[in-house]
């Protein structure tokens, strides 16, 4: 009994601590709408330079319990300045007024929200101040209460959705001289790269670069293993441009390995199937020419994007894959989804083999920070989806099979490389 009395204050203290346990969600993990670049977002300072009262700040996370949810906001305001803010969780909104204290942060509590159904929730912060009266610099959103227990949020400054990949197994001993894949974008947020034909030395696909520009990208890595600066790559390790198509830009790339980059600005259409082909032609025991071809929907013919001579090769295509990437991060809350279908490989002697099996993988962000990443089969094609904060996920390494089409790409009237630019 004496022991229990001795432990009682400790037990009560632990219970009190547990009841006050909080989830601190950094401001740098939030998204901005309608302009994803409408304020400055950084890991060091949170959200600053928020001027436009029409701008909304959004957090997304999974609440695993129903019940009361207490929310507060940590921010900075000039001493004596006031700011009125509205926080909306689901369909419920609360407003609060805060007075600044200069360089010190202040906490603005909102009335409790009721979470009726567990699952992903959107937290929308709005300024109710008139134009010209900034709402303050936002540091964090704080959650407490029964509904916050075991909540899952991305707490890292990286706001990108997880990158997702299809890995295609090839029969053992098969030399792959060509890799063909069809790709249909179903969603088209800015800063999306849907990559159709990847292999051990490069990748080929299409990007959404701005509201007015889209590109077809074909890139080939150098040898030597340099991670960032192509200026450090010795001449014998550099890939060399052999040819490029009409209107194609060709140059260097770095910071994700180094190599030769090429792109064609072209307004490919969401919802329409695009066709991609990569070929490998060994020229001697140590060099292979890799070429990327695109079936141009307007010209109704195959066009060359570019060809690169890669050193320390001499073989064919290996490690075939496709991927979808959110390369911007500022709109990582939006869903990206595309269909990948009718994959074929061609051997050096001209035999076509259909690839109907693929396995799923994702980058480190998909391990724990962002679980909204998926692969499956839809309308007879593989699909990749990531972002959107939708429930569920696909396990790493899961294998899928699609129905065979039996339709090999036999219409390959490819342009003569010697006639290319």
Q: Where are the predicted features?
A:
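Bacterial N-terminal signal peptides
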Residues: 6-14
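Positively charged n-region of N-terminal signal peptides that target proteins for export
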Residues: 1-4
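N-terminal signal peptide c-region/cleavage motif recognized by signal peptidases
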Residues: 16-18
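Short Pro-Gly-centered flexible turn/kink motifs
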Residues: 272-276
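Extracytoplasmic
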Residues: 21-267, 279-282, 286-421
């Amino acid at each position: 009994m004496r022991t229990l009395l001795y432990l009682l204050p400790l037990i009560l203290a632990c219970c009190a601590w547990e009841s006050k346990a909080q989830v601190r969600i950094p401001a740098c993990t939030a998204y901005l709408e309608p302009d994803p670049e409408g304020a400055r977002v950084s890991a060091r300072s949170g959200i600053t330079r928020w001027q436009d009262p029409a701008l909304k700040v959004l957090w997304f996370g999974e609440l695993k319990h129903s019940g009361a949810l207490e929310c507060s906001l940590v921010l900075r305001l000039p001493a004596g300045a006031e700011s009125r803010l509205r926080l909306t969780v689901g369909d419920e909104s609360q407003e609060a007024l805060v007075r600044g204290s200069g360089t010190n942060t202040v906490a603005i509590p909102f009335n409790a929200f009721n979470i009726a159904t567990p699952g992903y929730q959107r937290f929308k912060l709005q300024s109710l101040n008139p134009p010209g009266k900034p709402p303050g610099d936002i540091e964090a959103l704080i959650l407490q209460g029964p509904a916050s227990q075991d909540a899952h949020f991305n707490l890292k400054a990286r706001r990108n959705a997880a990158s997702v990949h299809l890995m295609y197994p090839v029969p053992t001993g098969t030399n792959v001289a060509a890799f063909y894949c069809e790709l249909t974008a179903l969603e088209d947020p800015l800063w999306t790269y849907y990559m159709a034909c990847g292999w051990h030395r490069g990748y080929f696909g299409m990007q959404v670069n701005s509201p007015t520009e889209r590109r077809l990208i074909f890139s080939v890595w150098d040898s030597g293993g340099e991670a960032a600066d192509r200026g450090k790559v010795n001449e014998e390790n550099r890939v060399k441009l052999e040819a490029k198509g009409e209107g194609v830009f060709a140059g260097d790339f770095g910071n994700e390995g180094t190599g030769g980059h090429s792109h064609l600005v072209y307004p490919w259409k969401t919802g329409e199937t695009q066709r991609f082909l990569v070929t490998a032609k060994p020229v001697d025991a140590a060099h292979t020419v890799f070429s990327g071809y695109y079936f141009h929907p307007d010209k109704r013919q195959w066009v060359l994007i570019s060809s690169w001579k890669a050193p320390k090769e001499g073989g064919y295509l290996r490690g075939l894959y496709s991927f979808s990437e959110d390369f911007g991060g500022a709109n990582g809350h939006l869903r990206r989804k595309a269909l990948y279908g009718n994959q074929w490989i061609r051997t050096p002697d001209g035999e076509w083999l259909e690839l109907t099996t693929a396995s799923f993988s994702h980058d480190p962000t998909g391990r724990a920070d962002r679980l909204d990443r998926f692969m499956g089969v839809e309308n007879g094609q593989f699909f990749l989806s990531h972002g959107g904060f939708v429930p569920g996920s696909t396990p790493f390494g899961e294998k899928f099979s699609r129905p065979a089409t039996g339709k090999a790409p036999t219409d390959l009237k490819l342009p003569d490389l010697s006639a290319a630019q």
